[in-house]
Amino acid sequence: MNMMLILLMNIALAAILISLAFWLPHLNVYTEKANPYECGFDPMSSARLPFSMKFFLVAITFLLFDLEIALLLPLPWAMQFPNMNMLMTMAFILITILALGLAYEWTQKGLEWTE
């Protein structure tokens, strides 16, 4: 019951914050505020260049493997429980899914930096 109450409160808070951010107007939007800050100098080129997908893919790959470490880090403390078969099965499934994702990324040449 307490978990459901906390879950509903979190969903309500998230909905309120999203609706406030969506419906509140942007205050004081003018060109100086929208321009990038270049230490007082005139910009040499456009600062609104498109973001490279290579950087994005590296960041997402790093995030996935960082999540893997965060999920597997408590494993030694959890090994004190008597039912380790389920725990090891879940850890093996997680590592297998991530290894398959890495293999797919490698075969699609997503890890190669040269174009």
Swiss-Prot record:
Gene3D superfamilies: NADH:ubiquinone/plastoquinone oxidoreductase, chain 3. The keyword Electron transport applies. The chain crosses the membrane at residues 4-24, 55-75, 86-106. GO terms for molecular function: NADH dehydrogenase (ubiquinone) activity. It catalyses: a ubiquinone + NADH + 5 H(+)(in) = a ubiquinol + NAD(+) + 4 H(+)(out). Its EC number is 7.1.1.2. It is an enzyme of class 7 (translocase). It is found in: Mitochondrion inner membrane. Its main location: mitochondrion. It holds the Pfam family Oxidored_q4. It is a multi-pass membrane protein. It comes from the Eukaryota. The keyword Translocase applies. GO terms for cellular component: mitochondrial inner membrane; NADH dehydrogenase complex. InterPro entries: NADH_UbQ/plastoQ_OxRdtase_su3, NDAH_ubi_oxred_su3_sf. One of its GO terms (biological process) is mitochondrial electron transport, NADH to ubiquinone. Keywords: Electron transport, Membrane, Mitochondrion, Mitochondrion inner membrane, NAD, Respiratory chain, Translocase, Transmembrane, Transmembrane helix, Transport, Ubiquinone. Core subunit of the mitochondrial membrane respiratory chain NADH dehydrogenase (Complex I) which catalyzes electron transfer from NADH through the respiratory chain, using ubiquinone as an electron acceptor. Essential for the catalytic activity of complex I. Core subunit of respiratory chain NADH dehydrogenase (Complex I) which is composed of 45 different subunits. Interacts with TMEM186. Interacts with TMEM242. Belongs to the complex I subunit 3 family. This is NADH-ubiquinone oxidoreductase chain 3. It comes from Microtus pennsylvanicus (Meadow vole). The lineage of its organism: Eukaryota, Metazoa, Chordata, Craniata, Vertebrata. The gene is MT-ND3.
